[in-house]
Amino acid sequence: MNIVFITSDQQRGDCYGFEGRKVKTPHLDAMARAGTRFSACITPNLVCQPSRASILTGLLPYTHGVSDNGIDLDPKVGEAGFAGAFTKAGYRTGYIGKAHFATSHTFKPTGTPECRNSDQDPDWNGPYMGFEHVELVVEGHNHWPPMKPPRGQHYER
């Protein structure tokens, strides 16, 4: 069994073709038809970092401690979330894209991989927050390419 969990950042809930919009999203439309869609979800917070921590952990912001952007999720709490549970159950887990469980402009720097510039260690691939393999967009709002892209490409471009 394969589980592909897709989240997007700062978009309306009805912005995809499978939601009736005119935009063409054929691959996402096919996945939506064949899979499970969570169409009645409510975000636990107005900004993305606490919301992403809640998705990973299943906890509300006042429980996992990330109440605003710039507050890093404790890796021990993150590792106990769904990715860690799937990993312990024998699934191969991975994360590709912008995780935003921590930031380089955090109020309390923790030294997690997301707190480094993306060109410092482009070949690092985890483990992280319960995921065995990660390919992160580090500093999720980069406007410059990394100095040494891994395997010749990078998700920031």
What is each PLM-predicted segment?
Residues 1-157:
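Formylglycine-dependent sulfatase
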